[in-house]
Amino acid sequence: HWLTYRDRGTLEELWPMVRDATDFVLALQQPRGEIIWARHADSTPFTFALLTGSSSICHSLRCAIAVARELGHERPNWELGAARLDRVIREDPDAFAPKHRWAMDWYYPVLCGVIRGETGRERLDHRSEAFTIDGWGIRCVSDRPWITAAETCECAIAHLAVGDRAGALRLFGWAQRLRDPNERYWTGIVVPEEVNFPGGEQ
């Protein structure tokens, strides 16, 4: 919103929420740098961190830091937390619950800007065969024939983030097969049967 409209009033209005949410999240950061996935209803933390979630958090922390700087608030602990999280995502995959079958763990570190440039392109290339069905898109899970619009389009953005425009356009083009006549996207499809999954969900 800020980058598009330069609406400082909205930025100031949202600041207390951004501040409190960021502090809440960083309270779940572990000594290695990973951030625990959630808290239970009684406020005790879960026992594991997720790579996809932590990648998204890393991007959100950078945005929160940018908001703080724009409003003149110093938050060195946020910058330290973001740096620690960035490092553990890039260097210590064992810090996260094993979710290797899921496509989001494959491309989210690239999508969220943690793994960039040639290293990011290599990461996308490395497991592309496991998750890509030519002409359709990206499997949600590597050993299941479920193609989803969300994973396909997110992975397209990840390709764009590392300069692979051709790969991004190819994936986005495939995703159009999941659009209905009203221009809405089906959540996913099972191939080769071409059955929408979950049934009827858009």
Language model features by range: what are they?
Residues 12-62, 67-153:
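Extended ligand-binding clefts on enzyme/binding-domain cores
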Residues 7, 73-74, 164:
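Residues in the short coil linking paired helices within alpha-helical repeat scaffolds
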Residues 1-30, 54, 168, 172, ...:
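Aromatic-rich carbohydrate-recognition surfaces in CAZymes
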Residues 115-125, 140-151, 157-202:
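CBM-like carbohydrate-recognition segments
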Residues 3-6, 62, 69, 111-114, ...:
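Specific register positions within alpha-helical solenoid repeats of the TPR/Sel1-like families, i.e.
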